[in-house]
A protein has these predicted regions:
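Non-catalytic peripheral regions of nucleotide-handling enzymes
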Residues: 21, 382-385
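Short acidic, glycine/serine/threonine-rich helix-capping segments at coil-helix boundaries
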Residues: 374-379, 387-431
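Catalytic glycan-binding domains that act on GlcNAc-containing polysaccharides
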Residues: 80-312, 325-329, 336-354, 358-376, ...
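Mature N-terminal segment immediately following signal peptide/propeptide cleavage
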Residues: 55-89, 94
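Positively charged n-region of N-terminal signal peptides that target proteins for export
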Residues: 1-3
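A general alpha-helix detector
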Residues: 67-71, 138, 175, 254, ...
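Bacterial N-terminal signal peptides
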Residues: 6-16
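Proline-rich, low-complexity linker regions of envelope-associated factors in Gram-negative bacteria
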Residues: 19-61, 362-364
């Protein structure tokens, strides 16, 4: 899990999802950029420059050891025993490779359709169906207890670790200690480090067996330590919430428990592909504008084959590639998956993979595959230029979030353009 809002699971988003699909993915693919949401999702984090040996200076490690000593004193006051600290922190050194990976962000990103090509590949669908068959009894019990469809749980398992194949081999405590010492997000990672020590102290796992991603996400479904403490469950009844073992039962149940506790509604889709009518008011295609499916149908918004979407509750229209490509009608369950990982691309990947595992068809509309997604530098330029001419994006951070989308839409309306909020290269060139 990859976001931290009010205790929600977190890890560096750029270290997630299709890292697990390394056998399908050629080297150097970089990151994925959802064109309308500006959230990068890494295919395979690569430390640049490649093949460089990172060596920690004696002075740097001495400062790390001094920090570690002060940290030990702080956490003793939080109830961590000397025995736990001795077992967990013995021999730790500053790992500069972890920091290099944390700093690694590709200048050029990949569009959502390339992300989905891997996230919902034929191989992943086949492996997911095999996993559903292998763990059918377990997943059926999990669905009965938590009310989360087994295909959704399997999709999370598939995107996080390729069904347990790539769970990460970095020592969690080593990684978190390094990241907590680093000043960039020190408080967040120190909180995670304390939680990891609490897990060890509770006896759920030994320090040696606590492994995962370089950013501290653990197990089959990649829980961060704080989220493990809040949401992990002992579904197999062996007395431990073991998300690290070869048996994925506890991890799968924990993912379902997490979604259930964040408001999952069984039987409600995360989203449905729709066809927009000619003359559709693109200014209404935004997350805070919701209607019932029947109300959308009255405006001509229907499924690709012309049917009305069943009334599953209030829904918004999401355009991942602006006015081109797939259009989605999204429901409250979309927000629930967002609690697991905040990137729209990830949510769509989970949702669409779960649909494919349940036997549904691929998206019917074509993506604008000829488009090039803006680079990080270009996204900042777009934000700067919009703000300078009175369409305030609220920040110049290279992330195309709701504020930037609204600014783009306002500019498009002012210019008589299609107001789809799509931050395209053509739009940037028009602003130059």
């Amino acid at each position: 899990m990859h976001r931290c809002i009010s205790g929600v699971m977190t890890a560096a988003l750029w270290a997630s999802v299709v890292q697990a699909e390394s056998l399908e993915t050629p080297d150097g693919l970089g990151s994925i950029q959802l064109a309308s949401a500006g959230v990068a999702v890494s295919i395979r984090p690569v430390v640049r420059p490649q093949f460089k040996e990172y060596r920690v200076s004696t002075e740097g490690n001495a400062r790390f050891q001094a920090w570690l000593g002060a940290f030990r004193e702080r956490v003793r006051a939080q109830g961590i025993s000397t025995s736990t600290l001795d077992r967990s922190l013995a021999g730790l050194t500053y790992d500069k490779k972890i920091i290099a990976r944390d700093r690694n962000q590709a200048e050029f990103s990949k569009p959502i359709w390339e992300y989905l090509d891997t996230a919902v590949s034929d191989a992943r669908i086949a492996n997911g169906r095999a996993g559903l068959e292998q763990y059918q009894t377990t997943l059926t019990r999990i669905e009965a207890q938590y009310g989360v469809e087994k295909e959704v749980v399997a999709a999370i398992w598939g995107l996080e670790t390729s069904f347990g194949t790539f769970r990460g081999s970095d020592q969690t405590i080593q990684s978190l200690a390094t990241l907590a010492f680093d000043a960039r997000r020190a408080q967040f990672f120190e909180t995670q480090l304390v939680a990891a020590l609490q897990i060890v102290q509770a006896g759920d796992v030994s320090p040696t067996n606590m492994v995962g991603s370089w950013a501290g996400a653990m197990g089959h479904t990649q829980f961060m330590p704080t989220s493990y403490l809040d949401h992990a469950v002992d579904f197999d009844g062996d007395g431990r919430r073991d998300i690290w073992s070869e048996n994925p039962t506890d991890a799968l149940a924990s993912a379902a428990a997490y979604l259930a506790r964040h408001g999952w509604t069984k039987g409600q889709p995360w989203g449905v592909e729709v066809r927009l009518p000619e003359g559709f008011d693109y200014a209404t295609a935004k997350r805070d504008y919701t209607l019932t499916p029947s109300e959308w149908a009255a405006r001509g918004v229907v499924t690709p084959d012309g049917r009305s979407v069943p009334d599953h509750g209030q829904a918004a229209i999401l355009l991942p590639a602006g006015g081109q490509g797939v259009a989605l009608m999204i429901f409250d369950n979309f927000k629930v998956i967002e609690a697991y990982n905040g990137a729209d691309a990830y949510v769509i990947g989970i949702g669409h993979l779960s649909d494919r595992l349940a036997g549904h068809t691929p998206f019917q509309a074509d993506w604008p595959r000829g488009d090039r997604v803006l680079s990080f530098t270009e996204r900042k330029e777009l934000q700067t230029r919009l703000t300078q001419i009175g369409f305030d994006t609220q920040s110049i951070d290279g992330r195309i979030g709701p504020n930037t989308i609204n600014a783009v839409r306002a500019y498009q309306l002012a210019q008589g353009l299609l107001p789809d909020g799509y931050a395209s290269l053509n739009l940037l060139e028009r602003l130059r």
